[in-house]
Amino acid sequence: YRIRNDPFLPDNEVLFFHTLQQNINVSIEGDLLNIYPKLNGNSIKKIKLLLSVIIKSVPFEPKISDLKKAADIKDDRTLKDYLAKLDDAGLIKLLMQNSLSMKAFDKPEKIFLANPNLMYTKEPNIGNLRETFFVNQLDNYYKNKQLLNDDGIFASKNGDFYCEEKYTFEVGGKNKGFEQIKDIPNSYVASDDLEIGIGNKIALWIFGFLY
């Protein structure tokens, strides 16, 4: 997953993580300040702390009170605003309930890192890595196509993801079945370690061509 998405592909792991950290700093200290010039040094510090908390936990269903405490943020509104800004910066992906949800005001159903590369700041769980890869590819597809207000992938009550508010996806390994989504129309399984899909079971790597 990392190699398929690398923008720099270094041979040296130390260089990889150093470059990764530099890109994160540029996104927060440069890009965000250009977009939101009213952000001050304390806000930037809190946003960095919030991202470090998220990196240690993703993907996860956020508890607002726990995130506020961990990132030393006083109120819900500020936390949701900082989360939305990290999403704007392309560092995290807020998975909302549906297209009517507003990232700056509503609680996200789940938080992902926007790119699987960021997961390599710690030892990633393979299941989390698969889901993050899937979210990354679909999210970039919708943004590049400028479809559905740049947001076409949502949390699903039955499967893992709900795309275009029509297609339900479960993401898993080669032996992942349809138990959770067997009675749902337009439902699919995206399977890792699968060379060629069959029927409604799609090889996960295929989604890499959407980027």
Regions found by a protein language model. Give the residues of each.
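Nucleic-acid nuclease catalytic cores
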Residues: 156, 186-198
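Hydrophobic beta-strand segments of well-ordered beta-sheets in folded domains
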Residues: 165-168, 185-189
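A short, acidic, amphipathic alpha-helical segment used as a generic capping/interface helix at domain edges
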Residues: 152-157, 174-176
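Accessory nucleic acid-recognition modules appended to NTPase machines
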Residues: 4-155
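Active-site-adjacent loop/helix micro-motif of nuclease/hydrolase catalytic cores
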Residues: 125, 174-183, 198-199
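Domain-level recognition of nuclease-like catalytic cores that cleave nucleotide substrates
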Residues: 195-211
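Structural motif
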Residues: 170-174, 191-194
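Conserved catalytic cores of phosphodiester-cleaving nucleases, focusing on short active-site segments
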Residues: 134, 138, 159-173
